[in-house]
Amino acid sequence: MPADSTQDEDAVLSYGMKLTWDINDPQMPQEPTHFDHFREWPDGYVRFIYSSQEKKAQRHLSGWAMRNTNNHNGHILKKSCLGVVVCARACALKDGSHLQLRPAICDKARLKQQKKACPNCHSPLELVPCRGHSGYPVTNFWRLDGNAIFFQAKGVHDHPRPESKSETEGRRSALKRQMASFYQPQKRRSEEPEARSTQDIRGHLNSTAALEPTELFDMTADTSFPIPGQPSPSFPNSDVHRVTCDLPTFQGDIILPFQKYPNPSIYFPGPPWGYELASSGVTGSSPYSTLYKDSSVVPDDPDWIPLNSLQYNVSSYGSYERTLDFTARYHSWKPTHGKPSLEEKVDCEQCQAVPTSPYYNLELPCRYLPVPAAGTQALQTVITTTVAYQAYQHPALKHSDSMQEVSSLASCTYASENLPMPIYPPALDPQEGVIQAASPSGRAPLKVPGDCQAPRPTLDFPQEADPSGTDGADVWDVCLSGVGSVMGYLDRTGQPFSFDNEDF
C-alpha cells in the first residue's frame, strides 16, 4: 500500500532511527537537535523522538486501539494493542468497505460490545485480537527524558486498522444526534396527549361553577321548630343570629357532613323572655310588656336553673337580660282540683322565706301580720295576679305542712284591667319595708315583718337614684290584669287556687 510504504520510508528516514538507543537504556540521547513528526499509525519495529511540546505525543495518542499494561519501570509507559472488532459475516457497507470497529478499552465494556449486533446486517460482532509480536499483542513504549519524548514500537499488527479515535468519536456523536432526533418527536407526541389531558382537566375545572363562599344564614326565632338540647322555643322580636352550619341535619350526637343549600333558613331559639318592671333604672328585656301574659304553652326550659327562688338562664349572654320568676312557691300556693277543702287551703302564716344568701332552708317559717283592711286585700290580689304570671308549672310543687284558714276575701277589690300599680320593693331594713298596691281607693302601705320579707332579686341591675322614692325604695309600675284574665288562665290550666274558701 502506498501509505504503508510512505510510512516505512519515513521510519527509515526518521531521526530516531538514525540514533542508537533502546527504550530500556539507562541513559537516553541528550539534547537531540532534531525531532520527528508525529505518526498516528506506527507499525513494525520503529523508533521516534518527539518534542516534549507535541500535544499528541503528550497524550500518547495512537490510531491503534492501545491499552495500558503493567510496567515495572515507572519512567516508561507501556501499551499493548487490543485488535479490532469486525462483523462475524464480514458484511460490506454501502461504499464497499467492511465494518472495523475500535475495541473498547475496558474489559467489561468490550465484552458487552461483543454481544451487540452488527449495525449493518444485525449479525453478531467478534473481536480480532492482535498477535503481531511473536504471538503477543504489539507493544508501544513511551518515555519522557529532558526535552524529548521517546517512542518505540515492537511488533507488526496482523489485523486491519480499526477506525481512529477521532472517527469513533464523530460516529458516536452522529449516532447520538440521530437518536435524539428520533426520540424527540416521540417525546413531543407523548407530551401532547398529556398537555391535552391537562388542558381538558383545567377546562373542566374552569367550566365547573366555583363554589360560592359560605353564606351567612339568617337565623330567626321560631316557636314551632324544636331543637335537640334546647326544647324551649323562643319568642318573637329576638335577636337575629348568623351561623354557618345547618342545624336541621343535627340529630342528637350524629353529625352529618355539611351540605350547602341555596337559601337555607335555620332557626335558633332567641333569648328567653322575662319580666318587665318599670322603675327608675330597672327595665327588663322581655318582649312582653305586661305580667299577665299567657304562658300556658311554654314548656320547661332546661337552660333555666332555680337559684334563691330566682330563675337564671344559663344561656343568656346579655348583661341586662335577667328573668325573675315570681312563682307560687314563694308563698306556698297550692293547686286544687274540684272542691276546695281544708287540706287544699293556703296558710299565710307559714310561708317559705327566700333570703338573698345562696344557701337557705326551704323549711324556714315566715309569718304575715293579721289580715289588714281593704288595701291589704288589694296586695293579696297582687300576689294572686303574680301567681298567674307563673311561666313554669313544675310537676312537684312544695306544699306547706300546716294549714290555716284566712279571713274571707269577699270584700277584696281587684284592680281594673291593665291598671298600672306602683310597688315599692323592700328597703334595706326588713322591719321598715313598705309595699303599696293599687286599689280603687288609692295606695295603702303594708308593713312586712323581718322573718317574712318579700324575695329580693339577687341579680345585678343598674340602679339609679330615684328622687321620688320613699325610704330609698324603688317604685315598680306593674301592669296587672283584671280578674277575667286571671280566671281565664286558671281555667285553661285546670288547676284553680283556693285561698280562704274562695276559688280563683
Curated annotation (Swiss-Prot):
List, alphabetically, the InterPro entries matched.
Answer: GCM (IPR039791), GCM_dom_sf (IPR036115), GCM_large (IPR043020), GCM_small (IPR043021), Tscrpt_reg_GCM (IPR003902)
Keyword check for Nucleus, yes or no.
Answer: yes
From which domain of life does this come? Eukaryota
Positions with biased composition (Basic and acidic residues): 155-172, 188-203
What GO terms describe the biological role, i.e. biological process, of this protein?
apoptotic process; epithelial cell apoptotic process; gene expression; glandular epithelial cell differentiation; intracellular calcium ion homeostasis; intracellular phosphate ion homeostasis; negative regulation of epithelial cell apoptotic process; parathyroid gland development
DNA-binding region(s) from the entry: 19-174
Q: Which UniProt keywords apply?
A: Developmental protein, DNA-binding, Metal-binding, Nucleus, Transcription, Transcription regulation, Zinc
Q: Which GO terms describe its molecular function?
A: DNA binding; DNA-binding transcription activator activity, RNA polymerase II-specific; DNA-binding transcription factor activity; DNA-binding transcription factor activity, RNA polymerase II-specific; metal ion binding; sequence-specific DNA binding
Per its database record, what is this protein's job?
Answer: Transcription factor that binds specific sequences on gene promoters and activate their transcription. Through the regulation of gene transcription, may play a role in parathyroid gland development.
Q: Please state what the protein is called.
A: Chorion-specific transcription factor GCMb
Species this protein is from = Mus musculus
